[in-house]
Every structure is written in C-alpha cells, then in structure tokens.
Amino acid sequence: MENKVIIQGEVIEVTMLKETGRMLDIFGVKIRKAEDGTEVTVECEASELDKRLLPGTKIAVLGYHTDKDEDGNPADRIVAKTLNY
C-alpha cells in the first residue's frame, strides 16, 4: 500500500543506506518535521542530492509512504520523489 506524503522541516543528517557505486546509491535523509518536531527518515537516490543538503537546511519532500521494501518484504519506508531545499 502506498500513500502520498509531503514532509516539511529541517535536515538533521544524511547517511548512505545502500551503496551501488553509481548514482543509484540510496541515501537516508533524517528530517525534523516542522509541524510537530518528530523525526522521520526519507529514502532518496543519490541523483536527488547535492552538496547543499547539510544539517540545518530547510527542506520539503514530496514522496510516498510504503509498507514494502524493494524485494516486496514488509518494511515501513518513506521514499522521496522530489526534494526541494
């Protein structure tokens, strides 16, 4: 099941989740949400990132919430389609 989400807030940290050696690397962007202060990690491809994405950067993410990983196994993930900062 997939649900569209919009997350606005401040970047806390950026970490690599899956390394492929190409621009298809998967990164996790931990964000403190502006609406309630909770923290959420959003997955995105390396091609969506650039050097300006540092801790403290204001960000808005358009993505989707899914309950499956890439192999179809159960997982709670938020995957970014678009990052604006």
Where are these regions (language model features)?
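OB-fold/S1-family single-stranded nucleic acid-binding modules
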Residues: 64-85
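Hydrophobic beta-strand signal
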Residues: 6, 60-62
